[in-house]
A protein has these predicted regions:
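Non-catalytic carbohydrate-binding regions of carbohydrate-active enzymes
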Residues: 1-123, 133
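C-terminal beta-sandwich/jelly-roll accessory domains of carbohydrate-active enzymes
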Residues: 118-124, 128-166
Length: 166
């Protein structure tokens, strides 16, 4: 191994960390670790001041390697969107009729976020966090809507399980 940073391997590692945080009652790391690693992953996806993802980065200086070769710029097979949806926003895929959300955003990081118009089990899903209640005007907290109807609410960020709503 030459030490280079590979976006796909980073995605796999972050997915594993998200799964660990979602499946362990008392994890030895916190959502803050996941969030910081996601920040670093996002920050790495620039080249010459523009959004870019390639095959791999130099581990010491963060520069994209092979960036001027044609094959590198078509190398986006990371799972970035999945990390945002299932990790940060916290939609936890399930086969049953239960909707489970567990955002891995530390409570002191974002005042609001919204994932909207997601087709999930044939239903239209919205997940939103509004710390103060003044962004989306639906009240404070974490809310889950299915087909426009609220099916779950929590005052704080954390696991929210909504049984038999799908």
């Amino acid at each position: 191994w030459d030490g280079a940073i590979w976006p796909f391997a980073t995605s796999q590692t972050l997915t594993g960390l998200a799964n660990y945080l979602n499946s362990t009652e008392t994890p030895v790391v916190t959502d803050s670790v996941f969030f910081r690693q996601m920040e670093l992953y996002v920050e790495s996806q620039y080249r010459r001041g523009r959004p870019y993802i390639g095959e791999y980065l130099d581990e010491t200086n963060g520069q994209w390697l092979m960036g001027d070769r044609e094959r590198s710029r078509y190398y986006n097979h990371s799972t970035f969107n999945d990390l945002v949806i299932t990790g940060l926003v916290g939609l936890r895929p399930r086969a049953d009729r239960t909707l489970e959300v567990h955002p891995l955003v530390p409570a002191d990081k974002w005042d609001w976020f919204c994932l909207d118009n997601v087709l999930y089990h044939g239903r239209n899903l919205t997940i939103l966090w509004d710390k103060n209640g003044d962004r989306y005007h639906l009240g404070k907290g974490l809310r889950v809507l299915v087909d426009g109807k609220e099916v779950g609410h929590a005052d704080t960020l954390g696991r929210l399980v909504c049984p038999d709503v799908l």
